[in-house]
Amino acid sequence: MGSRSFTRALALAFNEWLLMFMLFVNSIFSYVIARFADYSELQSPCLMCSNLDHILRRTKDLKKTHWDIICSKHKSEISSLVYCHAHGKLVDVRGMCETCLFSFATTNKSNAETYRLLVGKLGEDSHFGSKSDRSKYPNCSKLTDCTCCNQLWTPQTAATQVAEREILPKIGLLGKIRTGKQSAPKKSVSFNHLPDVGYTELKIHSDTESEAVFSDTEPKQESSLNHLPPVGYNEPKIGLVGDVRTGKPSTPKKSVSFNHLPDVGYTELKIHSDTESEAVFSEDECVVLKDEDHKYQIVDLQTHPIITLPYDLATDKLLNFDFPLEPFVTRNDREEVQLQETNWRTYSSFPVLIPVNDVPETSEKVFKEEEINSLDNLFLTSRAMKHFAAAKVKEEPIRLQDISSTPDVKENPANASLMEETELICLSDVTATSGAMEHSEVILKEREELIHLQDISVTPDFKENPANASLLEETELICLNDVTSPLRAVEHSAVLLKDKVEPIRLQDGGSLTPDFMENSANASILEETELICVNDVTSTSRTMGHSSVVLKENEEPIRFQDSSLTPDFKENPASTFLVEETELICLNDVTSPSRAMEHSTVFIEEKEELVRHQNITLTQDFMENPANSSLREETELICLNDVTSTSEVAETPEDVLEGIELMSIHDISLDEVSESVTTNQTSVEISKERDTDQADITSLESEYIVVPSPNSMPENSTDNCVSDKKEMKETSLRISSLSEMAPRDVTSHTEAALESESSSFNSMSVAAETNQYSGELLDLADAYNIVVGNEGHYDSNGRQQIENWMKKDTSRVSEDLKALLTQISASRGIEFLSPRDVSPKISVNSSDQETKNLDHDMQLLLQKRMLERNESNLSLEGVSVTEIEGESEGDRLKRQVDYDRKLLTGLYKELEEERSASAVATNQAMAMITRLQEEKASFQMEALQNLRMMEEQAEYDMEAIQRLNDLLVEREKLIQDLEAEIEYFRDQTPQKKNKLDVAEKVTEMDSPSEGMSNKIQSCLVGFDEERLYITSCLEKIENRVNGKAHDDNLPAQESVSELHERVERLKGDLYFLEQVMNSLGHGNEGVQFVKEIASHLQTLRSLSMKRQDQTEC
């Protein structure tokens, strides 16, 4: 039994592995087929169609269908996919829009209701869609992309928000607009508290042939009878108010009921209309709500309709939301939702109402003669709608952009009462967030309505109406163009908005025409109107807090841009009172941080009217008019150009300017003004390029001013001081005139930089002018006292000195500024600052090239001072600030602490620089040491390598010498052997034998004599060759020995000497042989003897040659 189970397990395992292998092969073939189809640009094969079961017709054994092959995981994924007939895509149903979802109506119309019911039960997920799409529409966070067509749409959520009964406010709007009557309430509306999903069933019937039916299921009457309503539930019935034109109410035909399901609530809304146009609700319906406490909310009902249309009109009418909706109208106790024939729509984008610019032009009776550009940010209140009902004779919209009021509207007394009681404010810059709405509820008090009128041009007909004068008298104007609107600014602005404060934002308007000036009723308006320019005031939370002190009762600022004073305005006696009481103060050069606001509050008291007239052209009629002389006499032009607005100055500018004689307008001619404009244009353009950091440097430099010493002051010092004062005033007037001609869109930060630049310029000019007399340092208060004490001595000499100072060459200015900056840098440690931040760009009657040269000289001077500071190691300890008259000890200590802190900051910077320099030097030294060590190591390695090579060469040479010595020894042995053999043969030759053989040899001598001679010659040649070989070897040895003579190799010399001896022996042997050869001629015995010797020598020679070849190889 066990063997069978084991065998079966092995068979199953084998089959499993075989199946896995076949699947792997199948997957490879499928991949290759898909790639080949893509490469050939053919249609990719279908997974189902490519199966052979469709062709082979599955057998009875294979009862499974091809759908059963799919695994459970992929079945769950496929179950949520829907095919879009419009785009041919198979995508997730939970992320499809309605266009793709109902595309089945174009192909299959039989199962439309079943398919729609299935989709409705599936529901839709609200988590689809990217965050980037939602960021584009911050007010509609539910927008998402369709998974099929990537179009924005609003999905239905499972957790539908339904308004609760206890917090449901009353819904109200206008009744009859033309008749001014409100319709009576019919029924109340209540909402069913559904747990999960609420579907709205919207059914709209018409008396005409065209009819659009909206339902969720086919049974229409059973939907309201399935369940009994709960306790406290009121079934609403919605009727219609009659035609607006006839004023007759229409009777309601059908009612609205709620289907009380345990899980899903369906709302059935049936609406009848007498017109041909059909009204269709959008997906996100909302209403504007107003409760008894005058608080405004927007409740999102989110009752999304399930749409049912005839099959032939499914794709056309399902997504057409361009139908106009009528407003909802309610009353006190009983509310009734009504659709009237006015062209209004409601939306659910909280808190901003989304405008609809594509309103169809079907109803011609609405929005006639009006140009509608936008309807967003519109809040309709009950009080505003009452006024709107009185003024809505021709059905004009409340907020109109770029609308010119016609004379008919202005002459109507009803419109005057409307505009008198209407409070206008511009909240276009307020961010529309929920937090901002919570803060804005503090500002929105009773009797404050929100209407935005942009670009309204007040025509003469409106001004001539006496009823409108009271409106302009009570209207208080404020310009909030440059006021930013964060939440903190809104909190601070709540202090300014009191009861009866109605600000209006008039853009590009307010041109005072002669008709407006001639009206006596308007004179009182202009007299009570206080004008101020808040264009240069930054709108941070701190400045708003300070500005609340300045803005007191009856102070209403208006910004008039490019207002030209015409001759009619000047000749009008009523307008002279306004101009006489108006004080013109130039605040262009006043810095606007919080400290400047603190000091400026001393000047601004009650009934001070600050007017900034930009680009005012003083014509000849204005100068010659005697009525305007009072204006020029009483007008005070105060230049605060030279007054620093920091808290470090002890005396306020008010104390300094009390005794200064101020120059009026009639003292300056138009020619001088134009000349000053052309003269200082270059300097102002250069000053605009300064950075905002110059303000801090100005605060440092303005504390010390070089003035003449009292002991060494010459007689004409008073005139010089007076000339300096006049010069400063003329310069400030010129700069102010140029700044008024500057563009209006310059930000407050740039103006602050210009103000600090001008202040630094004047302080530098005073120091440069007075530096030629002495080099003592005085504080700012003493300098002003000297100027004030020498006032009133303006004469021709003073004016001449001013002109001389204005015309002096640039080199003089450069030298004075160099000396001044030298003293300041020595006392204040100005070397810590960069040359770019310190060098002032001043140009007085000079060109741009001279200014650049001056700036370059200043940079060179500062660099020189920095080098001197580093070389001398000057200590900054013990430097104290000068005492200011009337300053308390605490303030002086504070200034001392601030000054010491700045010095410590500079010292810390210098210390950090030295630390960084030492660190760099240390790193460089370490790098150099490392490099030297590497070079030393490389040299050592190279020396060791060379030494090793020399040792190897010496060993090789010693081996060669040893081989030569061995060769010589062998040769000597050979020679000795030869000699021994020769001696042996000599001893063995018997005399008798020689005698017997003599006769035989004599007989043979005749014939072989020639052959024997040849043999002997050959033997001699062999000996000669051997001798030459031995000689060459000896020469080589001698050369080698001579080359290595410095080694003092004694064994080599001994071997050479032995070789010489052997050579000598060989020579002797050769001589012996020659003698033997000569003995051949003495008979047969000599010949036989020679033959034997020759044969033996030949054998010896052959043996020696073989051994030599072996040794050489």
Curated annotation (Swiss-Prot):
The keyword Transmembrane helix applies. Its main location: membrane. Residues 209-229 are annotated as: Disordered. Disruption phenotype: No visible phenotype. Myob1 and myob2 double mutant has no visible phenotype, but a delayed flowering. Myob1, myob2 and myob3 triple mutant has a significant height reduction and a delayed flowering. Myob1, myob2, myob3 and myob4 quadruple mutant has a significant height reduction, a reduced rosette diameter and a delayed flowering. Residues 888-986 form the GTD-binding domain. It is a single-pass membrane protein. Disulfide bonds: none annotated. Coiled coil: none annotated. Expressed in leaf epidermal cells, roots and root hairs. The chain crosses the membrane at residues 12-34. GO terms for molecular function: myosin binding; myosin XI tail binding. It comes from the Eukaryota. It is found in: Endomembrane system. Keywords: Coiled coil, Membrane, Transmembrane, Transmembrane helix. InterPro entries: GTD-bd, MYOB. GO terms for cellular component: membrane; transport vesicle. Membrane-anchored myosin receptors that define a distinct, plant-specific transport vesicle compartment. The GTD-binding domain is sufficient for myosin binding. The transmembrane region (1-61) is sufficient for the membrane targeting. Interacts with myosin XI-K, XI-I and XI-1. This is Myosin-binding protein 1. It comes from Arabidopsis thaliana (Mouse-ear cress).
